[in-house]
Amino acid sequence: MAKKDEKTVQTQEQAQAAETTAPAPAAKKGDNPVDIFRDALMKTKREGMTDLLDFIQDIGFLDAPCSGGNHLAKKGGLLEHSVNVLKYAEKIGVALLGGAEYNKVQDSVVIAALLHDLGKCGDYDKPMYVDNILKSGKPSEAKPFKRNPDLLAVPHAVRSIKLATLFIDLTEDEEWAILCHAGLYDFMYKDLKGKETWLQLIIHWADMWASRIIEGGSDKEGAE
């Protein structure tokens, strides 16, 4: 009888563990990336998120390219990349933290992953990327977009934090993860060294995996 009870308890514990092992996947084949992006951010219930999402749509984030001629240099590339980063940030987070601990910090992972490149949509009614037209008058096939010469070259991670905090509050960990998501490849490398955090590393690793492996990018254009 005792063995039967012990087996029952183990079965119940296994069932409970399965329920908390992993959150719902960030994306499934065929899902609309706009819906994934909106739904994930709204589920955080962060105050001001509805206004931020309205702003994100108005500013052109959903249609913006992710780079000039590197990974996902196409219309909608920035949205696609952001959803990819969330997908792999969740996988990394669950693998390293475990399902139960990950669920406690999931909101921060979602916010940092989906907003880390928010600044790439531009600012002051100016897009960060514009069409790259050659001297011949034809658009470049190798590098379809270029940095907008009319927009000052504020690092996009800095701009991401600025735009997000117009509408929502970010935690210190979230700000640091967004600011340093490029890791030692970007302008913050001296300040970051030795001050990495769990969230910053998860977002950095997910960003690298998405951009370099899944999306086929390289470092030929640096972080942007």
PLM regions and their residue ranges:
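Acidic, proline-/serine-/threonine-rich low-complexity intrinsically disordered repeat tracts
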Residues: 3-29
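Short linear motifs in intrinsically disordered/low-complexity regions
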Residues: 6, 32-36, 208
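Divalent metal-dependent catalytic cores for phosphoryl transfer on phosphate-bearing substrates
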Residues: 68-74, 80, 102-222
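Residue-identity detector for threonine
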Residues: 8-11, 20-21, 44, 50, ...
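Short acidic DE-rich linear segments
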Residues: 2-4, 223-224
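A short, highly charged, low-complexity intrinsically disordered segment
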Residues: 13-17, 218-224
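Acidic/His-rich, divalent-metal-binding segments that scaffold phosphate/diphosphate chemistry
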Residues: 22-139
